[in-house]
Amino acid sequence: VVNPSGKIGISLLILKDKQMRYDRQIILPEVGEEGQKKLQEAKVLIVGVGGLGSPIALYLAGAGVGCLGLVDDDLVSVTNLQRQVLYSEKELGKPKAICAAERLSALNSEIEIHPYAARLTKDNAYDIIQEYDIVVDGCDNFATRYLINDICIEQKKPYVYGAICGFEGQVSVFNYGNQKKNYRDLYPDEEEMQRMPPPPKGVMGVTPAIVGSI
């Protein structure tokens, strides 16, 4: 039944459109409508929207995660384009966080996206992280990983860790549910890790795509 204003009819059309957008995952018994609702209510912070962060952000936005935060203080460079699929040549020299937010909004206008064109530091990390349910690490340095880890422990939030080098990658989830293992259990000596020489810069473009998708 549609009232004279047509508002009920419009609401039904909007609801049907949302169901069609996510239909291919809603029909999976492991997801269903309840799972899709959880995705739409979720708030995920992605720290670093480069090689790892690009596929992470694209697929979370496509899946309908309701709120994404994007933290990155870097600018788009030509060397990024080989693997950082969020960006294009016309965005060279522009802030990654802002460009990523625009691209993701074009992909899915139904979700909230909050760009933070700044480095995650001890001064801002606590306030930023407390706005989200889960933190996904797409950064490339040990200091930021330890910072994310410690605040996630303090705020009792899951920390999804990822790293890549060459043809290899690592993925783990820390501080989830009753599982109390964290990043410091994997790498207990922070000072030793900070003294390590930087890893080789070489990486195949598909490596972050595979690791980020996991």
Q: What is each of the regions a protein language model found here?
A:
Residues 2-8:
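Extreme N-terminal basic, low-complexity initiation segments
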